[in-house]
Structure formats: C-alpha cells, structure tokens
UniProtKB/Swiss-Prot annotation:
GO terms (BP aspect): tRNA wobble cytosine modification
Enzyme class: ligase
Function: ATP-dependent agmatine transferase that catalyzes the formation of 2-agmatinylcytidine (agm2C) at the wobble position (C34) of tRNA(Ile2), converting the codon specificity from AUG to AUA.
Disulfide topology: none
Top-level taxon of the source organism: Archaea
Organism from which the protein derives: Ignicoccus hospitalis (strain KIN4/I / DSM 18386 / JCM 14125)
GO cellular component terms, semicolon-separated: cytoplasm
Catalytic activity: cytidine(34) in tRNA(Ile2) + agmatine + ATP + H2O = 2-agmatinylcytidine(34) in tRNA(Ile2) + AMP + 2 phosphate + 2 H(+)
Keywords associated with the record: ATP-binding, Cytoplasm, Ligase, Nucleotide-binding, tRNA processing
Its EC number(s): 6.3.4.22
Any one GO molecular-function label of the UniProt entry: ligase activity, forming carbon-nitrogen bonds
Similarity field: Belongs to the TiaS family.
Cytoplasm as UniProt keyword: yes
Full protein name: tRNA(Ile2) 2-agmatinylcytidine synthetase TiaS
Length: 397
C-alpha cells in the first residue's frame, strides 16, 4: 500500500521530507511493515507555486488502506503546512505530466480511487510521488537539531570526505562540500546524492559540522530525469526542444533561437569563448518555460561546429595578404606588395557532448546519472532502520 504526501512545509519552517520520515517511524511503531525506501519525487520546476523543496514523498507499507489512512491522517493533522495525503494500492499515471506540465487538481482528483485528505492542489504532487517508478538514484538527507534552526549552518567534513567522493564517483555524485548544505531556513542540514546507499551512509559519517538528529535515505528522480520532446510549449512547462542553427551571444547570455542559456548556469563560457567564429549547432534543449522567458536547463547531445577564415601570411615579409577580388585566388601583401595565388586558412573546431549547469546552479531533476536498481535483486528495505537513522536519545513519537 502506498502512503503519499506533499506540501507539508511552510516558507520558513517544516519540510515534507522530514514530516514523511517521522510518519514512516510512526507507522512502523504502530505495527505496519515498511516495504521499501521512501520515494522523494521532484516535481515541475517551472511552476511559480511550488513548495520550497519542490518535492513530494511516497512511503510503501504493508497494511489495510483504511488503517494506514486513519493513522497517517491523525499524525499529519499536527504537522506544519497544509498539504495532502493519499493512500491506495494503485495510483493514476500522472507522474510524467506532474513533472512537465500544469495539471488541473479537480481532474486529477477524479482519477484517484483511493483515500485522500487535504488540499487538491497538493494532491497532484502526492499522486505523482505515488505513481513514480524506476527511481534508481538516492538522496541521503540529514536534519538539524530543533534548537539550531534559525542559526547559521555549520557545514564541514573530515579531509577524507573529498577523497571518498573521488574514489566512489559516480556511486556518490554531485555532493561536494560546497553544495551539500542548503542556505535556506528549512530543517535540512545536508543532502548527499548517489546510487549506492552503503557508500552514501559512509560519506555521512565523515561529516563533522553541527550535529544532526535524524537522517533518511530516499529513492529519487533527482539528477536523472529527461523531459519529453513536444512540438508545442506552454507557460509553466518543462519540455525538451530540438534546435538546429546558429546561436547568438547577447550580453552575458546565449540565445538558441527563442531559448536562453542564462549566464547564471555557469556554462555560457563554452560559447562565449568562440566569439569571432561562425557556428552551426544541433542540440536537444531542456527548457523551463515561463511567461516572458524560456530558460535552457541543459544541453543534450550537443554537436557544435565552429569555423573561422584567416588571411594567409606573406611568405616574404610575414605581412597579411588580402584578396584581389572575388573571382580570383590572387592575394596581395598589404606590407610589401608581393602577389601570389594563396588559399585562405580555415580554422575548424568541433565540440560534442551533453552539458549541464555547474553544481549548485542546475535543477534538481537534471543530470545523467542512471544507475542499475538498488538493492540487488532479492533484497529490499523492509524496516525503517535501513532507510532512517535516528540519533540516540531522541524520542520521535
């Protein structure tokens, strides 16, 4: 049975992932058996009404829908935020659309035959988390002690941490000390990303900043989602578009037709360095569509050709040789007057690859880390202890 929830946070407090972690511990204490890691599902990055973390969570437990619903509802009525809870065995296929489009909450609610409670707007995210499959990446979140909330985070690691990241990559990825600790007021202390939970737990043991009281391992779509290609696009959508042609550098940004790669992504220098060259590119653009802007979130399968014609040098004095007309190969040295048939020099450069914004600037969803399923076949996370660690002496009830 799936227990899914969304929007249990507030602008300056609370966190849906923390609420879900505590709910999982609560349900286990009531005798319900946990069946897998909690799921953390990042949602549409284009909508302006998203929550701070822009994610919903789903838990999988063994038990009757009615009993799980009543127990979870009673627990969540005391939680921060005004979110939604959904409990059922089957969820409507709304996951891709909830990540890429704007959905009508009333229409989504009609498709769900299970039990639910809360706001319809939050129900969309909860149902998306409940329906999500194929989540082979993980995020390990650790939470601050309540008495430290509102104070600056103390985020530091043992020197061995960076050595572990280098050795374990890509089983641990995008978790450098500079980006693991968020800057906002939420209770998350740090987040380690990867695809191998045992190595990620080991990395957490090398954290020597402020103490944390709880840590949870989530399955997630983070760093692995590729939006679908569509001919049409509408405001507040996350979509992939194909572009062929020449890009243009305008100010600090780079334009691919109507789509803008903003300087803040940290990757515009790839194209700015080629100013003075003519260019032809073929690329798939992941685009966040908003009113007045279509921002590029990633460049996939980029193929770029750059070329520049250079005037040949005079073989006698080394001066520049200029053309004597369009219908002739004759050139004349501007310095000494020497004439000869000389072909212009053509400098060509080629770039191929997939490019994402730098760490700390990319969307949660963006990345190319698609790993084999974990745990290995025949093993699942059947108790909170394999996914949730609670510091000694803290009563979670």
């Amino acid at each position: 049975m799936i227990v899914a929830l969304d929007s249990f946070d507030e602008p300056r407090s609370g966190c849906t992932t923390l609420t879900a972690s505590l709910l999982a511990l609560h349900l286990a204490s009531k005798g319900f058996r946990m069946l897998d890691y909690p799921r953390l599902v990042r949602l549409n990055p284009a909508v302006p009404w998203k929550t701070r973390g822009n994610a919903a969570v789903a838990l999988e437990f063994e038990g009757s829908a009615e009993e799980l619903f009543e127990e979870a509802k009673a627990f969540l009525e005391r939680a921060p935020g005004r979110g939604a809870l959904a409990v059922g065995e089957e969820f409507p296929e709304v996951y891709p659309d909830a990540v890429e489009k704007v959905l009508d909450p009333d229409e989504v609610a009609k498709k769900f035959e299970g039990l639910w409670w809360g706001r319809k707007e939050a129900l969309v995210g909860a149902l998306a988390a409940g329906a999500a499959e194929g989540l082979n990446n993980f995020e390990l979140l650790a939470y601050r002690l309540p008495q430290n909330l509102g104070r600056p985070r103390r985020c530091s690691f043992h020197p061995a941490y960076e050595a572990l990241l280098e050795l374990a990559y890509p089983s641990i990825h995008e978790s450098s000390p500079e980006v693991v600790c968020p800057k906002g007021p939420d209770p998350v202390l740090l987040g380690i990303r990867g695809s191998h939970p045992p190595l990620m737990w080991a990395a957490l043991q090398l954290f020597d900043g402020e103490p944390f009281w709880l840590a949870t391992m989530f399955r997630t779509n983070q760093h692995s989602y590729e939006p679908s290609r569509r001919a049409e696009e509408y405001p507040y959508e996350f979509v992939q578009k194909e572009f062929e042609g020449s890009y243009e550098v305008r100010g600090e940004d780079v334009l691919f037709g109507d789509y803008v790669l903003f300087n803040e992504t940290g990757i515009t220098k790839i194209f700015k360095e080629m100013i003075g060259y003519e260019n032809k590119v073929s690329v798939k653009l992941d685009v966040v569509v908003k009113p007045g802007s279509k921002g590029v979130a990633a460049l996939r399968d980029l193929r770029a050709l750059f070329w520049k014609r250079k005037a040949p040098k005079c073989p006698k004095c080394g001066g520049p040789m200029v053309s004597m007309g369009k219908k002739t190969l004759m050139r004349k040295c501007k310095k000494c007057g020497y004439k000869a048939e000389v072909l212009p020099k053509l400098e060509i450069k080629v770039f191929e690859g997939t490019v994402f914004p730098v760490q700390g600037r990319k969307l949660h969803l963006e990345g190319d880390y698609r790993s084999p399923p974990w745990p290995p076949e025949g093993r699942i996370c059947e108790k909170p202890g394999c996914a949730i660690w609670v510091a000694h002496g803290f009563d979670h009830h």
